[in-house]
Amino acid sequence: LLSGLVLGACGNGSDGEGSSGDVTITYSIWDKIQQPGMEAIAEAFEAENPGIDVKVEVTPWGQYWTKLEAGAKGESMPDVFWMHSNEIAKYAEGGVLMDLSETYANSEVTSLDHFPEELVELYSADDAVYGIPKDYDTIGLWYNKTLFDAAGIAYPDETWTWDTMLEAAQTLNDPDNGVYGILAPLNRQEGYHNFIFQNGGYVLSDDKTESGFRLDEAIEAVQWYADLSVKYGVSPTQSQFAENSNMSFFQSGRGAMGFFGSWTTGEMANNDYTAANADVAPLPKGKQAATVFNGLANSVAASTENEEAALKFVEFLGTEEAMRLQGENGAAIPAYEGTDESFVNAYSQFNIQVYVDQMENAYIKPYSKETARWEDVENNALMPVFDGTKSVADVAEEIVAGVEEVLANEK
């Protein structure tokens, strides 16, 4: 964990109070595609709060957490920043995040009651709220309409099952010409975790003490997903994905179908090829319909020297007004109840409603205090499965032992 954060967190990333008496606070994010939406929110806030300027800073995901951790240990943290489910526990326990429960309990413009309970719980600990839900995301089955039309196959819909998808992938598969029926990389949130839930399994037990790889339902689901490449050959291999991402395959017309989160919608819209040739459908059903869902949050540095301004801004970020601006600007599906249509309408060229509708069958992205550690255990153990040299049954015990060791050490 981030031991030493409490002692180190003494600065902040803002410019503080300028000579004019204005206060500038920093708002740190990691997604450039969402930057226009976040800046629109900042401008609306500034218009309602003269004297407070908000500086939106974008740091790519790969460097974001390195920079934030360094800031937490004493250099400087941004005043307000995005938080992720994989990281919240260590930052909350490190004492570097401000408790926002009182701000929201006393707010006259918003309330935690407007957000999905699972997301509020995700960013809370010991009766304190360390992040205000910003958005939510689910996973969809994107498909290439042009390839489907050429093959005379009906587009995917809510009736599709694993078998329907496999049959379509086999028909569409044309590896000799560099086109694959489906894109199935070794990926948890957009990939095999969805299939575990669809098969009636789970990734972690409710009490976060056991790995779902104890169960046949998980083993069967992950094997079926891996077999898309290693048995059926309808997906590129993992070595191919090491050279080209699933998005790169899809956006160049070399993948007829792929699993992509709602956060990729802007990327699909901004790409000329996918804007003209692609659309999205619900995930196929196994024993049941299911998708993983997650959501980001907005947090405030406990070390901020601009506490009043930062709290005002994070309160505004949770209002219906700010959430609608987020959706209208195509940034993400807003977490505030009743505002998700703003995102759907921003991308009317795609059937984005499927992302919203799938919340009826959504399972919160598996998490614990040390999510990234047990995710690495899963990933490393499954590599030979996705290379075709081992089966999931061969590595299940290794996953169970490794994941449950991480979980046991969290207590």
Residue ranges and their predicted role:
Residues E43, A47-E48, D53, A151, ...:
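Extracytoplasmic/periplasmic substrate-recognition and gating elements
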Residues S20-K32, I52-E57, D79-V80, Y130, ...:
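Short, well-ordered beta-strand elements
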Residues S101-F115, E158, D176, G201-E220, ...:
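Short, solvent-exposed loop/beta-turn-alpha elements that line the ligand-binding surface or hinge
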Residues A44-F115, A150-G152, F249, G253-M257, ...:
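Extracytoplasmic "Venus flytrap"/periplasmic binding protein-like
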